[in-house]
């Protein structure tokens, strides 16, 4: 049986060499065995190949030996006549060669031939041959999806308790995040925790639940040694934003009660791709946008939200001169979604991925090579009409002030006096669509010089009157005429004292 299977394969392997040899110029005529050439001593001559075949039918075996002329070798590299064939009721095995009498051989046969053997594949067999590989591929794909899903579930699962074996020995048992931050701020560095400590914290955090998504990726609530933290997970295409935000957060002397507390930054391999983590303090109220959508605020609540926002921005904008000094920083994407509300009702500024720092010694601005732009709805007039001086750092600070004026308008609308308040709305909600273009905002803000409407009822409350006055002075078309963050902070501090509010 094995010899029979091998014989048909040998001519296929040698055909090219055989055909080439017979076509060489000057080659003599090839003598072959011919079973019909009785007059010529069973010999024939040819310029082509010697041929031998055996045909098996249901009742007999037919042998055939002869010469094949060169003209019949079609195609020349793999002649049809030399190929084995199978028809209903018969199977033919062939062999071609190019040496004298090389076809004087007996080709092996498979024995008695049955009709069933030659019939080829039936419909059931054909279906099985086709369905088999398809099922195998489907099962393989399902297995891959299952494995990937399990990896994700394992990575994001919520264990009953954290594995203490994951902690590294240099963070002693019982140490809290407050202890680590306190040690960092009193050690004199003021530029964030050591990288090894950051990595240790990040890699021993247990993710609990997803609490938000954005263009950068998503935010998770996590736990480290029982303390809740926020984990901002950037997608790999947002690596520049992750690196920039981590870099800004670790600026010397940046830590402030009204700026989101940075804990750690790390890149983690979750088994299928690399995640970029930024770990910070967790604030259960979420963003100011979410908070104002859910709740109205009292006069005291309004002042606390506004004053803490102004305090955070004033600290960002301020340059601290000294050995451990801090450069002035402009946010460039200030809005209610990038401000978080703390448990005590005050705010902290977050999302510093677009921030720029000013080096007063060289008067240069380190504008990050980042493809993102600020939020169009909150862009200042000079940003919308492209007249902003990108080489002048004060220009960026003034654009922040304009945006903060819009945030104050959002807060003041939710201030309830005598049960009266406005529904929450985004600035310019009545003038532009939900996702306005730069051109639509430029037409409203720069050409028509429109600003958010200030309700008449605000004039009946001193606190709302002060807030309205601050807003108008933040919205001037001329950036140089706008208030500074420090001036706004002082005005609101005086207002809080008048209202008897303790911050």
From Swiss-Prot:
It catalyses: L-threonyl-[receptor-protein] + ATP = O-phospho-L-threonyl-[receptor-protein] + ADP + H(+); L-seryl-[receptor-protein] + ATP = O-phospho-L-seryl-[receptor-protein] + ADP + H(+). It is found in: Cell membrane; Cell junction, Tight junction; Membrane raft; Cell surface. Keywords: Apoptosis, ATP-binding, Cell junction, Cell membrane, Differentiation, Disulfide bond, Glycoprotein, Growth regulation, Isopeptide bond, Kinase, Magnesium, Manganese, Membrane, Metal-binding, Nucleotide-binding, Phosphoprotein, Receptor, Serine/threonine-protein kinase, Signal, Tight junction, Transferase, Transmembrane, Transmembrane helix, Ubl conjugation. Glycans are attached at residue 41. Kept in an inactive conformation by FKBP1A preventing receptor activation in absence of ligand. CD109 is another inhibitor of the receptor. ATP binds at residues 211-219, 232. A motif (FKBP1A-binding) lies at residues 193-194. Residues 30-126 are extracellular. The active site is at residue 333. Residues 1-29 form the signal peptide. Its cofactor is Mg(2+); Mn(2+). This is TGF-beta receptor type-1.
